[in-house]
Amino acid sequence: MNRGANSDSIPTDLIYEILSRLSVKPITRFRCVSKLWESIICRQDFTELFHNRSSSNPRLLIGVIQGGEWNFFSSPQPQNHYGKSSLVVAADSHMKFSEDKRPRYYSYASGLLYFPNIRISNHNDDVVRVICNPSTRQYAILPPDLRTRYRDSGRLFRNKLGVINLEDDYDGGYLLKLRMFVLEDFEKQKWTTYVHTLRDENKIKDNDNVYVVGATASGQIVLARNKAYKPFYVFYFNPEKSTLQSVEIQGVREEEDWFHRVYYFVDHVEDLRFDVMKTTYAATSIRPAEQNTSTSSREDHLVRTVKRKRA
């Protein structure tokens, strides 16, 4: 059967509408159906439409380091609690990468990840600086003359600076106290302090290392463990309503009983574009990463986390 001939008989407007309702994974596969489908997917109006629809449903991007590899997954972020204290969602698997030798220095912005020390086998095993799009499985290597111009770490923020302090408290049982210090007026150095008590005996145990990993555009504070075990939980705290919602994420390396360091990227927006290649620098390579089987980023707050035990 000639797939290209059959697809060309379908009205272009109908193909456009069908593709626009799909997630990024099948769309990237359908580029191979025919030249017509590829041309539609690469059209600027299509990529912009896809990005706008994805922006209304941001996801939680999860990076798991195990066996010398980054494994990327994503899951839906709860938009509204609707009175539910717990949810179960499925994770989508995206791509694998060799482990960055200095994983603490990664950066995230506009759906792209920057790694300063990635080893790629088909580049003479040299350690290189890489920018990748985990949704489309594309990556680009920074040219040598540009690699020294960027620091190994950095965050973007636009309006308010926030410091979140997470404390343990054993008064009458295990609980977490969340202290938020928000810079309301930069020139006057006016800070506002908010204190919240979090408790979920069924999901958070006294030996769990729970950290603040970010804040969503809707204002929810995201908490998670730095090393995850089955079941895999992420927690969303709404400061306005003082509600804590636990979300069990299924499909994250379920063949393993446990895995190593986990990193989280809040408000990830799937994007078909890889415009950083055109606007920032001339890339030496763009290719899908090998595999075995977007706000674009949170720009409203710069969040630092501190975790300590009370004496």
UniProtKB/Swiss-Prot annotation:
Top-level taxon of origin: Eukaryota
Region (Disordered): 287-311
PROSITE patterns the record matches: FBOX (PS50181)
UniProt-listed CDD domains: F-box_AtFBW1-like
Start and end residues of each F-box domain: 4-53
InterPro entries reported in the protein's UniProt record: F-box-assoc_dom_typ3 (IPR013187), F-box-like_dom_sf (IPR036047), F-box_dom (IPR001810)
Pfam families: F-box, FBA_3
PANTHER family (alphabetical): BNAA05G37150D PROTEIN-RELATED, F-BOX ASSOCIATED UBIQUITINATION EFFECTOR FAMILY PROTEIN
Name of protein: Putative F-box protein At1g31090
